[in-house]
Amino acid sequence: MSSEQTQHLRKYSSLPVWVVEDHHDVLPFIYRAIGSKHLPVSNISFIHLDSHPDLLIPVNMPADTVFDKESLFSELSIENWIMPVVYAGHFSQVVWIHPCWAQQIKEGKHYFLVGKDKSTTTIRVTSTDDYFLSDGLYVPEEQLESPKSLHLDVILLEPVREQQCEYTEQVESVAKKIKLAESDQVVEGPFTDGPQPILQSTSESSEDGLVKATCSNASMDTRNEACMLNSHSNVSKNIIEILEKGSAYVLDIDLDFFSVKNPFKEMYTQEELVDCVENRIHQLEDLEAAFADLCEDDSDETVQRWASNPGMSSLVQLVHSLRSRMEAPDYEMIHQAGLTCDYAELPHHISTETEIERLLQSVNNLLKYLPKPTLVTVARSSLDDYCPSEQVDYIQEKVLDVLRSLYGSLDVHLEFSPGSSSA
């Protein structure tokens, strides 16, 4: 990892794992690691496995709140706790790794600024992704003070195929034997906490072995399995390139990555949902009629007539805004575009035990190519019903098992009330 800061960081004897309920409650432990000099003050990379990006911003929070950590912690919630840390200068690289049912931000690389809005003194961003636009968080660069650069990578992690689980266990068994045989060989690397067994050569050997086995085996299943492992290796290489820009990294896992609920789906009765749909149909009919009239005549009289209807008052501001930008607005096109821009609902996918196992194997395959993190944070997210309460304990144990298999001894801190999520 880059920077001279790395050379002066303290090392934990065992990898600390902080397990909390609400996701933003991991932040005090990250700040504690910064204060104890286990993490640098700046240029930290943050690897975030979650069904939700958590990259919103407290809309009305003054930007300078980030410089008073106790005030900051009291202002944050589960959806908006990462970006203030970026503005504070601690996180410079964020990788959101998401399952296939979570599509809130476009996949790929996003480079933008996070800074203080000169007019409101709140935190805002220069990203034009719908995720930020829909919450009114975008401002142009010239409107920002003290901007911080953020490199955001959004990466999809596919579950392994069912047939692969047993096959991968065999590969890992071989890899362990290779590690034992090479236990006398150690390497000092920029990612290590001192001498450690050679991991990179083992991973490469395993991968090469998989490729050779595939070439000599006509089984399509085996080829697919090897391709999946190779895919995880490629994703890991991409993440390693990102980590090389930072001075240290935190691995963060929300257990709803493996199984997630949209708690709002259960808040309404069938009758309430029917009423909501009927009201929405009437609203769409009114909008269609209003825009049809505007196509014929967009005079102030027409606009005011429609704006007098319930729920249509914002039409005046919309039409005035359109007229200021174009001589003859195409109201039909604007109406059609409006019908397609509803923001995606919260992800909802209650996984089977098999699906959870397959995702756990994918996470294992991904992490085994990465260097050891400085610390791990885990959010249960069960009290707010994002991770199913009947699954959360099982998922937590399985995740800890994966971490132990990869990193050895763990220093686990359970910072939540025992039994708080029991079904």
From Swiss-Prot:
Among InterPro entries, the record links this protein to: UPF0489
Give the record's family classification.
Answer: Belongs to the UPF0489 family.
In Swiss-Prot or TrEMBL terms, this protein is called UPF0489 protein C5orf22 homolog
